[in-house]
Curated annotation (Swiss-Prot):
Site positions per UniProt: Not acetylated by pat acetylase: K17
EC id: 3.1.-.-
Taxonomy of the source species: Archaea, Thermoproteota, Thermoprotei, Sulfolobales, Sulfolobaceae
Impact after mutating K16A: Decreases DNA binding affinity
One MF annotation (Gene Ontology) recorded for this entry: nuclease activity
Modified residues (N6-acetyllysine): K16, K48, K64, K68
Annotated gene: albA1
PTM comment: Acetylated. Acetylation at Lys-16 by the Pat acetylase decreases DNA-binding affinity. Deacetylation at Lys-16 by the CobB deacetylase increases DNA-binding affinity. Acetylation at Ser-2 is involved in the regulation of the turnover of the protein.
Protein name: DNA/RNA-binding protein Alba 1
Residue numbers bearing the N6,N6,N6-trimethyllysine modification: K16
Annotated effect of mutating F60A: Decreases DNA binding affinity and cooperative side-by-side binding between homodimers
Native source species: Saccharolobus solfataricus (strain ATCC 35092 / DSM 1617 / JCM 11322 / P2)
Localisation: Cytoplasm; Chromosome
Residue numbers of Glutamate methyl ester (Glu) PTMs: E69
Modified residues (Deamidated asparagine): N31, N58
Biological-process GO terms, alphabetical: chromosome condensation
Amino acid sequence: MSSGTPTPSNVVLIGKKPVMNYVLAALTLLNQGVSEIVIKARGRAISKAVDTVEIVRNRFLPDKIEIKEIRVGSQVVTSQDGRQSRVSTIEIAIRKK
């Protein structure tokens, strides 16, 4: 989830946009034939990641998607003034049944 590395093609990074933008991105990947995608978020965006997965799983593709794995953790982030703080992270892997 660092900004310096390229993002794999099956990853949706959650940020400040509306949830439906990320739902559309996930659905697009699944419709292109990707069998498994990973939704990643950190900090305040974690709730959007959970919402994204639940909307895809329950509203758009019921009985066709399963949650493969959920990983939670934290990252140390250094602010502009040099202070370090921890930010929670989540990665939710979903796949077609």
